Structures are given as C-alpha cells and as structure tokens.
C-alpha cells in the first residue's frame, strides 16, 4: 500500500517500522528529525546515498513527555512536549544531541497537560521569538489560558504571553515565507453534527479571538455559551479557509522551495488525519490551499490521497492503513509525509521532463 499522487509525481517509502511517526523537521543539510510521542523521543534519519530512502537512523533525544513540535534555529533543535520547550545543542553531521536538553520555558507555561496534547512550535522569521500552539483540555467549555491559545515567547523561552485565543485545538502552525504572516490550522468542536463546526485555517493576529467556546465562523453563537460572553462573540474572527468538519487538520506547510510548479510556490499544504466520529468519514489526505498575493483564496483541492481502504463517502467507519500527520520539505524539495497507524514516512517527488 502507498499513497496516491497525481501522474506528474512519484511516491516512495522514505522510512518505515517507526515507533510513532508524527511530526517532522528538516535541517538545511538534509537531516530529518521525527517526533515520536508515544516513545518519548526524537529520531534522526539520514539519506546518505541520495536514493530517497533513509539508510541511517539514530535516537537524537529521549526521555521526553509526548514530544511533538520541532524547529531548528542556529545550532539548536527546539522540541515542544507537554512540559514545555526544550533546546538541544546540535551541529550538522551529528547523529545525536551534543548535550542534555534544557527546558527554556518556565514550569506551567502550557497549562495543565490533559486533553489535546500536541504542542507545536514555529520560530519567527527574525529569529527573535517562537510561537507554540496549545489545544484545549476538552471538547467545549470555558478554560483558563493558555489552553486553546497560541502563545508567543522570546527565543530564550522567557516573556511568554497569549498571542491569539479562542482556538479550540490549533495544531499546524507556520509563517508564510513571503509575508511573514503566522497561520494555524484548527480542529474545531464536536457534538453539533457532521456539518458543524468546520475545521479551518486562519491568519493569526496579535490579540485576536477566534470563537471557541462562545461562537464559530464569526459571530455564530454556540448554544449554552454565547450569552456568557457576548463581547467575545462579536469579536470572533472569520477563518480564511473552511475545511470539511471533522477532517482533523494537522501539519501546515508552505510550498516555497519544493518540487512543485511555479504557480504553487505561494501555496500551502495541509495534512488531514481524518475523522473519528463522523457518520460519513472525512479527511485522510493532503490538500493544497492556493494563495494569491500572499493570501489564501479560500478553497482547497486534493493532492495526496489513498490512505483509505474503503470507498470515500460511504456511511461506515473508515478503514485506513495510514493517517497523514506531519510534513516537511526535504533538502531536494521533495515532500515528506509522516503517517501514523502504519508509522512510516513517505516521500513525494516530481517526475522529470
């Protein structure tokens, strides 16, 4: 079994037999970092002979508490887990961290650890700050910050503050490479049927509020909560792109520098891990979100599919062999996709002329 890609692309297995393939980051020198939360570790993979498949594998760091977010900056690898952000010294060519990791965020910086557990990190283009996406503890309810927020920190881990709020479960988080705008993709609330509430992609602004738990898609009131904070209902931002409800968007990756057509270089890709409770299963694919002049056009289309064993659209529990979660561009511009369930990394490359 393998993902299905358009005819002008090819797919090959980059790595398999992993413990828990979730999140990816790639160094400029080509080393691939993989967060494996259930194993509490970060794995380093290298394709030393350039054949498109990892032939070297080592444990970069271990003993972490559900590590998920990964970022590289200077001579350090940043890892976000349930306890905070850890910084590890590293140099290209090294197969392990050069020393013990240091937790640079203060205790309790992410709130309690229950509920949505992914903590993903993006470093600002100027290298002065990093941002962490922190999901809610429950499906819907009033929860104290920093749950359901994106927090900003100085690059040394100090100065943490809420940057944007009302985000039920923000997972993928990334800066647009040209505009510098910070975007996230959000898993919205359950319990309102198959058609509500759409998951979404949104540009984040400092101090902005995005609805949860009082409203959704702008000032549409959430029953049982809207009357508690009518001021926040009115402040709720409308997302830039709405995804099919319960698609479970995970990684957000911009295409610039990848093996894609010139008119795709401004676009984004989003990994849909797929629904778990929808009557008609949805997701289980990678989609392309077109941009124009640095802004999303508001629609999306399939790019990588084939993770389902049954026919899409049927009212049945989905049978899947893989759920796409993490994405990164390899040094050669190919697209790497980490899929849990089968715990493999797939490589998508463009065919030559």
Tell me the role of every PLM-derived stretch.
Residues 13-18, 58-64, 104-113, 162-166, ...:
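Surface loop/turn motifs at the tips and blade-to-blade linkers of beta-strand repeat domains
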Residues 3, 10-38, 247-254, 270-271:
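Beta-strand-rich domains and repeat architectures in extracellular enzymes and scaffolds
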Residues 1-7, 118, 136-139, 148, ...:
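Beta-propeller domain segments
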Residues 29-30, 74-75, 126-128, 180, ...:
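Short coil/turn segments that connect the beta-strands within blades of beta-propeller domains
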Residues 27, 35, 80-82, 88, ...:
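Residue-level marker for isolated small/hydroxyl-bearing positions within beta-strands
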Residues 56-57, 66, 71-73, 83-125, ...:
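Asp-box/WD-like beta-propeller blade repeats and closely related beta-sheet repeat scaffolds
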Residues 42-75:
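Blade-loop segments of beta-propeller domains
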């Amino acid at each position: 079994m393998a993902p299905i890609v358009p005819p002008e692309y090819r797919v090959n297995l980059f790595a398999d037999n992993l413990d828990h393939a979730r999140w990816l980051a790639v160094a400029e020198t080509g080393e691939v970092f993989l967060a494996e939360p259930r194993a509490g570790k970060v794995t380093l993979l290298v394709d030393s002979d350039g054949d498109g498949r990892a032939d070297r594998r080592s444990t970069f760091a271990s003993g972490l508490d559900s590590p998920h977010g990964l970022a590289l900056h200077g001579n350090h690898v940043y890892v976000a887990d349930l306890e905070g952000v850890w910084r590890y010294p590293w140099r290209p060519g090294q197969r392990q961290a050069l020393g013990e990791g240091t937790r640079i965020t203060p205790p309790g910086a992410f709130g309690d650890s229950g509920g949505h557990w992914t903590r993903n990190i993006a470093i600002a283009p100027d290298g002065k700050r990093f941002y962490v996406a922190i999901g809610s503890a429950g499906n819907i309810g009033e929860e104290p910050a920093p749950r359901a927020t994106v927090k900003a920190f100085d690059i040394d881990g100090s100065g943490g503050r809420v940057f944007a709020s009302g985000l039920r479960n923000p997972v993928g988080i990334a800066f647009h490479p040209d505009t510098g705008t910070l975007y996230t993709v959000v898993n919205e609330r359950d319990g309102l049927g198959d058609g509500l509430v759409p998951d979404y992609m949104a540009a984040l602004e400092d101090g902005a509020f995005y609805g949860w738990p009082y409203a959704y898609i702008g000032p549409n009131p959430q029953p049982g909560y809207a009357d508690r904070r009518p001021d926040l209902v009115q402040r709720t931002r409308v997302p830039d792109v709405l995804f099919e409800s319960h698609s479970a968007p995970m990684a957000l990756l911009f295409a610039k520098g990848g093996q894609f057509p010139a008119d795709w270089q401004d676009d984004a890709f989003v990994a849909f891990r797929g629904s778990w409770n929808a009557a008609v299963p949805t997701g289980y694919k990678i989609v392309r979100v077109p941009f124009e002049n640095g802004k999303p056009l508001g629609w999306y289309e399939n790019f990588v599919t084939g993770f389902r064993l049954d026919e899409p659209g049927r009212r049945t529990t989905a049978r899947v062999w893989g759920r796409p979660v993490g994405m990164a561009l390899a040094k050669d511009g190919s697209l790497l996709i980490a899929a849990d369930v089968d715990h493999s990394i797939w490589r998508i490359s463009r065919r030559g002329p």
